[in-house]
Amino acid sequence: MEESQAELGVEPPLSQETFSDLWNLLPENNLLSSELSAPVDDLLPYSEDVVTWLDECPNEAPQMPEPPAQAALAPATSWPLSSFVPSQKTYPGNYGFRLGFLHSGTAKSVTCTYSPSLNKLFCQLAKTCPVQLWVDSPPPPGTRVRAMAIYKKLEHMTEVVRRSPHHERSSDYSDGLAPPQHLIRVEGNLRAEYFDDRNTFRHSVVVPYESPEIESECTTIHYNFMCNSSCMGGMNRRPILTIITLEDSRGNLLGRSSFEVRVCACPGRDRRTEEENFRKKGQSCPEPPPGSTKRALPSSTSSSPQQKKKPLDGEYFTLQIRGRKRFEMFRELNEALELMDAQAGREPGESRAHSSHLKSKKGPSPSCHKKPMLKREGPDSD
């Protein structure tokens, strides 16, 4: 085959070239040349060294470098419980200390609203919440006002109220003064001091008491609540109370008052919903003093006014009916209605008079066995 192609002078296609021809096409400094094999041999240890090393350490395996230990996931932080639960009982003291709030409705646009029936403040995250301080007589100089949050339910009271880890790490709403873990802040007061009690671990914020301005009867402090009530890792839907105390310069108590707080997205809606539920439960009715007798509420049947009897219509109407069969049907229907009126006792005298009038007007009813005789008039009759 090759000889025949050589004789004809036709070159074979590439697929028909021999292996020797392809080998000659490779460059001289190929990967399989002996020049590149020498450095590789130098990298390998001599056989004598390997034998010596195995004889010296027969029981030791080659030690591989240990991989760096993976950073273990940090466990959930368990904050220490407080051994001190502050009192939440209202104490006006000698100065008649009490709190007040601005009147606001339940519109969706409100950012802060107070419910007097619930003694509860509804507000949005980091929004201004004005709290009024009322006193009957001015307290001594150096008096301070402290605000502290505690959990309302008994099973949570020993836990410290703090912000959620998400809000603690967030740089939003950071003023550079308040610690990131504090829930309550004071807005617009550079004299505010934030305390972390070393013994009770409670968080509080203290501001100096300022006398009311001219033509004003109360002092107003603007608070901010820096975490939602529904935040996981924080309040986690647990109700909280804010305790406002009036203290002298030595920390002695002069007055105390408290209110519940809910930090939510729509304060007006939540206030309206909780007040409706409160009224449905009947808790809005004040309890009678001890020793007083409760009056039973009248039953609904006796309290409801009696329905007035509608007088029977005394008018009479004449209805022309075509066909005796239809007439009998309407007559029976009318008698049934008259009987119902008589049994109901509505205007019995008038019903009897009305039925007698119908009988006299109708005349004797034809017998069902006798066919009434009707005179047929022909076309010639007058």
Curated annotation (Swiss-Prot):
The modification Omega-N-methylarginine is found at residue 322. Binds 1 zinc ion per subunit. The modification Phosphothreonine is found at residues 18, 273. The modification Phosphoserine is found at residues 15, 20, 33, 37, 171, 258, 304, 381. The keyword Transcription applies. Residues 1-44 are annotated as: Transcription activation (acidic). Residues 104-281 are annotated as: Interaction with AXIN1. Residues 88-289 are annotated as: Required for interaction with ZNF385A. One of its GO terms (biological process) is positive regulation of apoptotic process. InterPro entries: p53-like_TF_DNA-bd_sf (IPR008967), p53/RUNT-type_TF_DNA-bd_sf (IPR012346), p53_DNA-bd (IPR011615), p53_tetramer_sf (IPR036674), p53_tetrameristn (IPR010991), p53_transactivation_domain (IPR013872), p53_tumour_suppressor (IPR002117). A motif ([KR]-[STA]-K motif) lies at residues 359-361. It is linked to p53 is found in increased amounts in a wide variety of transformed cells. p53 is frequently mutated or inactivated in many types of cancer. This is Cellular tumor antigen p53. The gene is TP53.
